[in-house]
Amino acid sequence: MNTLLAKKKEPIDKLAAASAGGRSLGAEAFRRMLRSPVAITGGVITLLFLLLAIFAPLIAPKDPQIRYLQDQVELGKGIIPGPSPGFPLGVDDFGRDFLSRLIVGAQQTLLVGVLATVIGVLIGVIIGGLAGAFGGWVDTVLMRLVDVLLSFPSLLLAISIAALFAKPSQWTVILAVSIIGVPIFARLLRGSMLAQREADHVLAATSLGVKRGTIVFRHMLPNSLGPVIVQATLTLATAILEAAALSFLGLGDPDPTRAEWGLMLGNASRQFLDIRPELAYYPAIAIIVVALGFTLLGESLREALDPKNRR
C-alpha cells in the first residue's frame, strides 16, 4: 500500500514543477530580457552600481574621512574649494574629497536598501504565507493588519516610524523602510497562495492525504514566490529613494563622518546650496539613476515572466 501511494505521489511533484515552469521558463525569460533594450539598460546600471558599492574602498581615490582642505573652507565667507586636479568634484564643508565620499556612499546606500528589502520580504512572506495557507480567521486578522498599513502613504508611514525613535540611526531607517514594504509582499504572496490552493497538483496531493505542511512548503510556497521576487527588485528602488528621503529630512544616521547619499544631499541642501549647489546635484543624480536602474530591471523581469507575453 505504501509503495502504491509513493508511486501515486511522484506525478504530483512533476505536475508542480510543470506549473512553476521549471528551468525552461527561466531560460525563456532570460532570453526575452536580453532582447529588451530596457532590461539591458536597467541591468547595466544595476551591475555598475553593485560593482561600485562592493569595491568602493578600492575605487575611491582618497580616504573619504580625511579633511584634506579643511583650512581652506570658510562657510561664513562662502568659500568651499571647487574642483581641482587632486579633487575632481571638489570638497565638502569639512574639506573631504567629495568624489571619494560619493563612491563610498554607494556602499551605504546599497546596504540600507538591501537590508530593508530583505527584512520586508521575510516578514511579508510569513504573514502572506500564513494567511494564504490557513485562510479563515487567520487570513481575516492578518489582512486587516495589512490594510491598516496600506491605508497610510508609504513615505508618511516611514517618517512616522522613524520619528518614534529618540535617537535616529541607520537601523531606524532600515526598520522604517522595511515595514512599509511588508503589506505589499504579504498581499502578493497571499494572492499567489490562494491561486495555488486550486492548482491541480495541490488538489491531487490533498486527495492522496499528503500532510498540510508538506503541501504548503513543497507545492504551494515554491510556486508562489515568483511575483514576490519580481516585486523585491522594484521595492529595492523604492527603498533606496525612501531611505535617502529619511536621511535628507534628518531622520537617518546623524553621524557626519558617514558617507551616505541621502545624508550628503541633505547636508548640501541645508548648509551650502547657495555656495556649491553641484554638491547637492551629485548625490541626487546618483540616487535617481540607481533607482531608475532597479525599476527598469524589475519591470523588465515582470514582463518577461508574464504568461501573456509568452510566445
Which residue stretches match the model-derived regions?
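Transmembrane alpha-helices
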Residues: Q107-I123, G213-L246, F294
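Residue-level hotspots within pore-lining transmembrane alpha-helices
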Residues: F55, Q107, L149, P153, ...
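Gly/Trp-centered helix-boundary motif
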Residues: M1-V125, G129-L130, W137, L155, ...
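Short helix-capping/hinge motifs at transmembrane helix termini and TM-loop junctions
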Residues: A56-P64, G132-G136, I161-K167, G250-D255
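Residue-level signature of the cytosolic catalytic core of signaling kinases
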Residues: A18, G22, V91, F134, ...
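Glycine-rich helix-loop "coupling/hinge" segments at transmembrane-helix boundaries
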Residues: L150, A162-F165, M193, T235, ...
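Generic hydrophobic transmembrane alpha-helix motif, especially the helices
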Residues: P88, D92, F98, I119-I126, ...
